[in-house]
Structure formats: structure tokens, C-alpha cells
């Protein structure tokens, strides 16, 4: 069995000793952006294990996921957790994360994967587009240099993951003869799921520890979520997100020109709001 390959960077490369705590400590939006990301990334083994098993008999996909993708995803969680611990040392991360994980585990089941491997690869392209978008935006909006560095590193990893998933998708699309309509439905459904699933759960569980009196206040939680989405929306290039999402459709250029506007509006109203 092949040994796992070291990630492209290490947590030790991050300069936590130079963290500008004054720039982070009182920034409520930054706290939730970093903490929610740390929860979701730290739970990566729940879904990476399912995906590794789903492609177990494909040596190339299985090996890459096991030796590269999974360790890199888990390192993202460890690095973000370390950042939260340095920036907000009074926050009980472990307790809040355990509470989040108990709920999150219900949404990381193998039966929730797409019905074919090509469509699951298309769904992964959506997820990697979302994570690359979020971390690129976080790197731009963060006022604290260490988080800027960390978010930039994670964004680069996610873009690299997207490239692999897209390559695997093309191979499976050819083998399964999956049409554009099924791919489009998968892309749309997974985009909608991104809008409603992970972040709201993470916000609730972070708030329970950060601001117990606010945890049951729906208006407060909605405000936090809106602030996070606004930070992303103001600090990204929608054109890049659009190209990444549309790429699996392999549309001819004239058709792409026709459908680009409605897809762009869909992304703006669902993916970025």
C-alpha cells in the first residue's frame, strides 16, 4: 500500500507567534468565519471516508483521495482550529465542535452521495468551487495577516482539488455517457444544498459557546449568516466562480453565451446571498 504524501504545506509554516490578536479579537464576523470553517473542515473525515470507499475499486481516484485529498482536508481543520485557539483563547472550541459534529454526522452518509460516479464528481466540483470561493474571499477580507496567509493556502489547495475532481469527472462522464441535463440538475441541486446546509449549523453551535444568550435568537443567527455571506460576496470575482461551476457542462461557446446570464443570476441569488 502506498504511503501518504506530505501536504503541500504544514501547520508549522504558519506564523502564529506573529498573530495580530487586536485585529481579530473583537471582530465578530471574523470569529464566525474562522470558527465555522474550522468546524466544517475538522469534520472532513466523515465525508472523505465515504468518498474514498465509494471509489475504492478505482486505483487512481482512491489513491489520490486517500494520499492527498483526505490528509489535506484534515490539515485544513487542524490549522483553522489552531488559529481559533490563538486568536480567541477563551472560546471552548472542543465543546462547541462536539456539539456541531453530533448534528453534522447525520448529513455525511454514503446514501447521500450522487447516484453515479460521474455525477458525484460533478457534485464535488461544486463543493470545491464553493470552498475555493469562500477561502479566497476570506483571505481578501481578513484584517489579520496570519488568517490571510492561512486562507490563501487553503484556497490554493481547494483549487487544486477542483482540478483533480474535474479530470476524474470527465473520465467518468465518458464511461457513463452522462448527458448535460443530468449534470446540470446535479450542479443546481448541490449549489442549493451549499446555501442551506453547513454554515447555518456551524453558526448555531459556535454561538452556543460564544454568546449563549444569543444562541436561540434567530434574528441574531440570521444576522451572523448575512454578515458572513456579505464578506464573501464583496471579496470575490464572480466570473471565476461562474466558470468553475459551468465547466462540467462542457457547453459549446454559442450556447454558453446564451445561458451564462441566467446561470449568473442563479449563482448571485442562491450561491452568494
Name each model feature, range by range:
Residues 1-273:
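Non-heme di-metal
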Amino acid at each position: 500500500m502506498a504511503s501518504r504524501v506530505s501536504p503541500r504545506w504544514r501547520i508549522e509554516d504558519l506564523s502564529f507567534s506573529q498573530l495580530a490578536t487586536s485585529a481579530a479579537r473583537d471582530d465578530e464576523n471574523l470569529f464566525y468565519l474562522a470558527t465555522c470553517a474550522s468546524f466544517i473542515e475538522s469534520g472532513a473525515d466523515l465525508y472523505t471516508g465515504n468518498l474514498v470507499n465509494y471509489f475504492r475499486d478505482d486505483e487512481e481516484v482512491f489513491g489520490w483521495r486517500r494520499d492527498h485529498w483526505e490528509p489535506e482536508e484534515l490539515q485544513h481543520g487542524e490549522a483553522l482550529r489552531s488559529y481559533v485557539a490563538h486568536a480567541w483563547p477563551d472560546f471552548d472550541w472542543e465543546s462547541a465542535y462536539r456539539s456541531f459534529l453530533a448534528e453534522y454526522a447525520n448529513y455525511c452518509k454514503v446514501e447521500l452521495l450522487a447516484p453515479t460516479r460521474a455525477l458525484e464528481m460533478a457534485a464535488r466540483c461544486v463543493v470545491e468551487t464553493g470552498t475555493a470561493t469562500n477561502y479566497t474571499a476570506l483571505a481578501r477580507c481578513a484584517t489579520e495577516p496570519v488568517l490571510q496567509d492561512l486562507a490563501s493556502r487553503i484556497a490554493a489547495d481547494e483549487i487544486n482539488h477542483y482540478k483533480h475532481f474535474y479530470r476524474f469527472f470527465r473520465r467518468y462522464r465518458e464511461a457513463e455517457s452522462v448527458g448535460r441535463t443530468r449534470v446540470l440538475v446535479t450542479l443546481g441541486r448541490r449549489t442549493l444544498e451549499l446555501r442551506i446546509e453547513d454554515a447555518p449549523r456551524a453558526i448555531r453551535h459556535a454561538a452556543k459557546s460564544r454568546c449563549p444568550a444569543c444562541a436561540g435568537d434567530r434574528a441574531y443567527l440570521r444576522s451572523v449568516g448575512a454578515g458572513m455571506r456579505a464578506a464573501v460576496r464583496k471579496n470575490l470575482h464572480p466570473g471565476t466562480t461562474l466558470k468553475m461551476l459551468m465547466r462540467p457542462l462542457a457547453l459549446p461557446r454559442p450556447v454558453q453565451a446564451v445561458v451564462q446570464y441566467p446561470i449568473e443570476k442563479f449563482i448571485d441569488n442562491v450561491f452568494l446571498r
